[in-house]
Amino acid sequence: MLFTQLIILLTVTSQALSVTISDLNNIASNQVTKRLGGGSRGGSSSGSRGGSSSGSSSGSSSGSRGGSSSGSSSSGSRGGGSGSSSSSGSRNWGSNQYHCSGNSCGYGNYYAPSTAAAAVGYGTGRYTGGTQYGNNQYHCSGSTCGYGNYFAPSAAAAAAGYGSARYYAQHHNSTSSESETISGSSSLNIPSTHFYLIGFAAAYSIVL
């Protein structure tokens, strides 16, 4: 009689545990799905950052990040062709190519970072000093971006083509877009039959 009662008690307990584990599985699955967002997290970031560099523009248009930038500033107007120097000092640079110094970028006459850089043609194709990067492709250093001659973060980066599509591809594994999709669910996956076996084993050991 006692053995029969023990078997009944353990069977009921096993069924209750089975229901509880099933509920835990469902709860865990829902929680993981909520945390992962259940779908796409991300997107694409494609498009060109920049544009053509033609037209009349000049000055130290700081904050500009490429584009067909035009306008005027305190350094005067340089109508689209000859970028001859008319303002101050030996550090002035006179080409009409987009270039930057520090956090300021612009077309036309613009200060080179040093007298030596201006003397050897800062902003022209022949400038190769230091870590200067000299083609007319959109590129960035730190948080500042621009066309034309611009300082690469290192000599190695300049030599590897810093700012070019191949450089970006080598360092980002993608040239135009990045996306990330994370979805799914998880559960404890504990079979309820295990609890029946555990219950009967416990009952058998008690009887013995």
Swiss-Prot record:
Induction: Repressed by HAP43. Down-regulated during oral epithelial infection. Up-regulated in response to galactose.
Chief location: membrane
Bias (Gly residues): 36-53
Name of protein: Predicted GPI-anchored protein 37
Region (Disordered): 33-93
Function: Predicted GPI-anchored protein which may have a role during host infection.
Subcellular localization, as worded in the UniProt entry: Cell membrane
Lipidation sites (GPI-anchor amidated serine): S185
Key words, A-Z: Cell membrane, Glycoprotein, GPI-anchor, Lipoprotein, Membrane, Signal
